[in-house]
């Protein structure tokens, strides 16, 4: 993800992030299935999706910690 996209994610609400996280997990499942069957055209997409999942989880956790501090 680009820095601009990360800023947009940080400004969005947790419900939107949770939906996006679910979509990315489903995409990762499909990519892994394609990899196993030999139909995957772009193996780097798996890495990109995993990184995006980690970034969204980090943003959600930061929001949780910020809420606990208040």
UniProtKB/Swiss-Prot annotation:
InterPro entries listed in its UniProt record: Ribosomal_protein_uL29, Ribosomal_uL29, Ribosomal_uL29_CS, Ribosomal_uL29_sf
Indicate yes or no for the key word Manganese.
no
Q: Which GO terms describe its cellular component?
A: cytosolic large ribosomal subunit
Q: Which SUPFAM superfamilies match?
A: Ribosomal protein L29 (L29p)
| Classification via NCBIfam families | L29
Q: Which HAMAP family does the record cross-reference, listed alphabetically?
A: Ribosomal_uL29
What name does UniProt use for this protein? Large ribosomal subunit protein uL29
Question: Which species does this protein come from?
Answer: Clostridium botulinum (strain Alaska E43 / Type E3)
What lineage does UniProt assign to this protein's organism? Answer: Bacteria, Bacillati, Bacillota, Clostridia, Eubacteriales
Which gene produces this protein?
Answer: rpmC
